[in-house]
Amino acid sequence: MGKEATTRVRRRERKNIASGIAHVNSSFNNTTITITDAQGNTIAWSSAGTMGFKGSRKSTPYAAQVAAEDVSKKAQEHGMRTLEVEVAGPGSGRESALRALQAAGFTVTSIRDVTAIPHNGCRPRKRRRV
């Protein structure tokens, strides 16, 4: 006698946005790429972890390249063609993600490094001795 559970499938509406900003955040452990419009609204995002890489493989340049290819495919469905790229973080996936975005067919108009530099903020972690 109870109601049947109806699940609604949320369809992604196709926005027609020609240009946007790609935020590449590359840490020591992972690389996330978010493509937004000029106002900062997220259009598509991906990361090395969501692409199925686990553990230390997430921090590789290849994982960043696969994530960049995935996010570019999603953004091109919305009609995006030109990108400004903002790169942040010290990780190894910075350059490979940028190269993958260019290879996907985007016109990259500018590349900015927006890595936050502390003015003597938090104490850094101890040095690695190998």
From Swiss-Prot:
GO biological process entries: translation
Keyword line: Ribonucleoprotein, Ribosomal protein, RNA-binding, rRNA-binding
One cellular component (GO) term of this entry: ribonucleoprotein complex
Lineage: superkingdom: Bacteria
GO molecular function, a single term: structural constituent of ribosome
Known role: Located on the platform of the 30S subunit, it bridges several disparate RNA helices of the 16S rRNA. Forms part of the Shine-Dalgarno cleft in the 70S ribosome.
The protein's assembly and partners: Part of the 30S ribosomal subunit. Interacts with proteins S7 and S18. Binds to IF-3.
Protein name: Small ribosomal subunit protein uS11
Top-level taxonomy: Bacteria, Pseudomonadati, Pseudomonadota, Alphaproteobacteria, Hyphomicrobiales
